[in-house]
Amino acid sequence: KNGVDLIFIDSCHEAQHVQKLMSYYFAYLKQDGAIFVDDIDSLPSRLKKNIWNSIVYDLTLDSVKEFYYNNTENCSLKVFYNHEANGLAMIYKKSKFGTQPNKVNKIWNYNIFLKVLYPYLRRLSRLFKQIKK
């Protein structure tokens, strides 16, 4: 009836599930309230070479960012990192209690192949510039 100040999501760690929870509960959050999402940083898992948790935590952070990117007028996003923990994201609500979030649409992103290829292309470009001199 009056809304809540804080929502903490530490669920099954499936990106779509986390996004669904944020979308559902956002309207119940008071203005200046926050949704916290646990386990969004893969570094501790990557250091342990735990591929499954690394992927899951990265995808969870991606889903939190997608929610934010589709709702920038309603909220802000802060991400907290600690190399000994799995990170925490905070969605801070700027809009009034009862405000429904926008539907989350996929935001364009570059191809992961280009992310891997880019550093090599930069090196080649520098090499060609040096050869040209």
Task: Name each model feature, range by range.
Residues 10:
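Active-site residues of response regulator receiver
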